[in-house]
Amino acid sequence: MISSKNGAAMISRPVFLSDRVDEVFSRKLDLSVSSSSSSSLLQQFNKTHEGDDDARLALAHQLYKGGDFKQALEHSNMVYQRNPLRTDNLLLIGAIYYQLQEYDMCIARNEEALRIQPQFAECYGNMANAWKEKGDTDRAIRYYLIAIELRPNFADAWSNLASAYMRKGRLSEATQCCQQALSLNPLLVDAHSNLGNLMKAQGLIHEAYSCYLEAVRIQPTFAIAWSNLAGLFMESGDLNRALQYYKEAVKLKPAFPDAYLNLGNVYKALGRPTEAIMCYQHALQMRPNSAMAFGNIASIYYEQGQLDLAIRHYKQALSRDPRFLEAYNNLGNALKDIGRVDEAVRCYNQCLALQPNHPQAMANLGNIYMEWNMMGPASSLFKATLAVTTGLSAPFNNLAIIYKQQGNYSDAISCYNEVLRIDPLAADALVNRGNTYKEIGRVTEAIQDYMHAINFRPTMAEAHANLASAYKDSGHVEAAITSYKQALLLRPDFPEATCNLLHTLQCVCCWEDRSKMFAEVESIIRRQINMSVLPSVQPFHAIAYPIDPILALEISRKYAAHCSIIASRFGLPPFTHPAGLPVKREGGFKRLRIGYVSSDFGNHPLSHLMGSVFGMHNRENVEVFCYALSANDNTEWRQRIQSEAEHFLDVSAMSSDAIAKIINQDKIQILINLNGYTKGARNEIFAMQPAPIQVSYMGFPGTTGATYIDYLVTDEFVSPLQYAHIYSEKLVHLPHCYFVNDYKQKNQDVLDPNSKPKRSDYGLPEDKFIFACFNQLYKMDPEIVNTWCNILKRVPNSALWLLRFPAAGEMRFRTYAAAQGVQPDQIIFTDVAMKSEHIRRSVLADVILDTPLCNGHTTGTDVLWAGVPMITLPLEKMATRVAGSLCLATGLGHGMIVNSLEEYEEKAVSLALNKPKLQALTKELRASRLTCPLFDTMRWVKNLERSYFKMWNLHCSGQQPQHFKVLENDLEFPHDR
């Protein structure tokens, strides 16, 4: 907002009338402005003093004192025409021109008087005032000093010299001048008021108050002192006292534009914009060229959203004062808000051309660069802003956002700390810092920040929603649900809260209004996609939702595009890639250089499944680089991969652009994304395209939607070509099953029949037929649970074994099952176990029941390795077909894969009631574990390498990525040369 002189008015008696003029009036005319209007005064004069120059000059003086400057000038000029050598009249004419803001004419008439009377001290004083108003304070000071030299006891000149020194920041000299003026004239209210201004400028508010009060005591009608008192109250936040005193100032001096400007500011601060505009318009009536008044009117229109009016008034302000910095800055803001961004940039640059270190203009220009994804220039502007000001929090906040987007979480948190140092009650900064803490796993600190934000701003829906997310991440699901609902109470149209509440409810089997909520969420997603807004449903959640696969593809595309935007913020030039020459050909590499990027090299299902893969690659043909996005968790899985991979780089502390540079410097030919859209992913690295071929594999069972990912490694069952339209990548079909595991190397103990645990060890009934599902509860839905309940009711003495995954879902699941007629003892929940124990105890189940909407992938592999048959129903999306592929790769898929829920139910009941049939299937499954392709990790690695060479050879031949199938007897690959 533009601010006028809303503190102390820099007062100086702008014009001084000489003693000679006073002597003229010693013959006292019966003319009094206080008792007559200007018109009656003129009538009275015309009757009695028509040809009397002294009387006419006295009349002009009276009109001047009454504020009728134009009439005063007319009569003074009549005297001037008859007698141009009257210096007292020249002094008065100069004074009138000053009041009319015609400063050049003021100076000219005073110079004319000085040519006649060179020792006329008052003329020098008045010229000094005019030069000061023209902005030449140094010349003004010279003229004040001449006036004082000519007349050392000229108290008014000492007072006005003080105001000039104050304008130059020479506070000590200004104070001495005020004190000298008051020693000459203790009743000089101007000097008392100026001394108050000096005290205020030095932070001595009580002393300033005393000075202003003394001025009012001496002269209760002294409007400027009332105005300055009002300024003190305004700055202390006592707006009602400020309002009272500014009103008194304009009542005492109706022609007081600065007081009207400040009165308008008080009304504006009190939320009374109509009265504020009226005050600014009063100021304009007295000072039509007041840029400040136009600017302040514009600021009100801006805050009211009347941007066209705001722009018009800002332009009027600039037409009056082309060097009005705040008007350029604020006009830029208004233009930006209506989409005229290029014009806004020109305004900010114009402001900076006039004042290169203008903090608001630098920050606002930085905001635009930030929106344009020009993060380098934006950062530079924010840092430059902070170099010239210490009181602005916005540049710290924006730098924090940039640092966070670039993965520089430490600096982001430091910047948010600075925001909160400047404004400890900044709820937005608390939420943003909480988000940063949450992103790096410091959930407890995130929760504290969100709760503090809510304490400061209880109606802040975002704080409640983010608190809910942190509660969910820390396992406090019920608290999460409560907080999401509170966020939606505060803001019913809150897409992120709506979508996240739905996901949280699915995690705990809360299916009330499920269809209605999914319809609402799907509507939100489609609307966001049409508006080119990042969808509130993440791709990882979309794979488990009953939504159209094409819609899931569109969600992934939007997230991929967002990653491209993040990548562009680093401003890297395009990478140069290794030459497209076949491996082992002249000029080519001796080995294919493969890079794996993951945040899951540690205690994570990905490492449980792929632990041996990185060391199993054939070093004669392939050179493997692993890039770890997460810090060392010191687990056996991390140590194993780190020791067995040919090259292992911990890049967790590096920014994404630095990681991309390293990958490119390592001359990686094929880069594998093992995260996709899972936690810890940094897909912006792939958006920078550091490698010529980029592949999605294993971490995310769905399409990335990314133009910068060329291939998806999958298999014919999981991603048949008939469904290729729901993928953005070209499909690479590995033989058998794409889903690798390491159990043959790491979990041999499961094969020992003597190591089988007892059901009683886990509170499982020895006499019941146990169905089991070890998937997370969010993968379940009423349709499949209804089917399970039907199965339990049809199979005597049966039970369903589930995991507290999470524990908060147990009671809701039990309640739902009971409503379907299932007995309480037929539902058994146990805690989640460590990996090896989980696989060992899985053998205690008789049949595994899979979830169709999102299969058991890792858990599906677990139970098949344990030798327990699994019933699965494949649908269309990738995540719904993985379990079927696992079953097929055992060679026994026909006994476990079904085509409908009806068939699913019948298969489960049939296996439970036909003991010989189940025993035969179980025996076959257990016998196949050491020979079937599903658990042959080395065989799988060779097939994966075949796919890599096919990708590279296609690239070398100049062909675009294309769907292809890997054959185990393909002679194209080095294994078979």
UniProtKB/Swiss-Prot annotation:
Record's keyword terms, sorted: Developmental protein, Glycosyltransferase, Repeat, TPR repeat, Transferase
Stored Gene3D superfamilies: 3.40.50.11380, Glycogen Phosphorylase B (3.40.50.2000), Tetratricopeptide repeat domain (1.25.40.10)
PANTHER family named among the record's database cross-references: UDP-N-ACETYLGLUCOSAMINE--PEPTIDE N-ACETYLGLUCOSAMINYLTRANSFERASE 110 KDA SUBUNIT
Native source organism of the sequence: Arabidopsis thaliana
InterPro entries, per the entry: OGT (IPR037919), OGT/SEC/SPY_C (IPR029489), TPR-like_helical_dom_sf (IPR011990), TPR_rpt (IPR019734)
Family annotation (SMART domains): TPR
Function: O-linked N-acetylglucosamine transferase (OGT) that mediates O-glycosylation of capsid protein (CP) of virus in case of infection by Plum pox virus. OGTs catalyze the addition of nucleotide-activated sugars directly onto the polypeptide through O-glycosidic linkage with the hydroxyl of serine or threonine. Probably acts by adding O-linked sugars to yet unknown proteins. Its OGT activity has been proved in vitro but not in vivo. Required with SPY for gamete and seed development. Mediates O-glycosylation of the DELLA protein RGA, a repressor of the gibberellin (GA) signaling pathway.
Protein's recorded name: Probable UDP-N-acetylglucosamine--peptide N-acetylglucosaminyltransferase SEC
Gene that this sequence comes from: SEC
